[in-house]
Regions:
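Hydrophobic transmembrane alpha-helices and their immediate loop junctions
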Residues: 1-161
Length: 161
């Protein structure tokens, strides 16, 4: 039996802060224990994704968009936005917040001296950037070309998140 629990942004803020804290501690410890470098690299890649998602969410909250939060602690998407209720301008603000966050994250890691931790994190962040281009950019371009806000609701969100 699966128990569905209503959670707000505070739960995910705490969850993600723990992920980032473990990541930073692993990064710090990777100087003396190589295995921690792998954990740190994967954690930094996950942090890139979380940074991207939180940028979307904070922009959605700022735009007063209607959002539904995930119900499972392991949800990969923090929320699903009801895009039919927002303006085109709000849609662009929310979309570009995630794009900009990913760009900042990539620039940050490109500015660091090369290391194994940085290499793993950068690879994962680049994968995120490619996925963003494949899945999110076409939606934003479609909104630019047409005069409508495209559906951005995540299909089956309630079932998987």
């Amino acid at each position: 039996m699966v128990v569905i629990v209503k959670r707000g942004w505070q739960f995910y803020a705490l969850r993600d802060a723990v992920i980032v804290a473990v990541t930073l501690l692993s990064w710090w410890g990777s100087q003396s224990i190589e295995t921690l470098g792998i954990i740190a690299g994967v954690g930094l890649g996950m942090s890139a994704y979380l940074f991207h998602e939180w940028a979307h969410l904070l922009a959605a909250i700022r735009q007063k968009a209607s959002v539904g939060f995930a119900t499972r602690w392991y949800a990969i998407f923090l929320f699903s936005m009801r895009s039919g209720m927002i303006s085109k301008r709000a849609f662009f603000d929310i979309s570009f917040a995630g794009f900009f966050a990913t760009l900042l994250y990539l620039l940050f890691f490109l500015s660091l001296p090369p290391s194994n931790v940085q290499a793993v994190a950068l690879l994962l962040a680049q994968c995120l950037a490619v996925l963003t281009l494949i899945f999110e950019a076409p939606i934003a371009i479609w909104a630019m070309v047409t005069d409508r806000v495209p559906a951005a609701d995540i299909p089956f969100f309630d079932r998987f998140c």
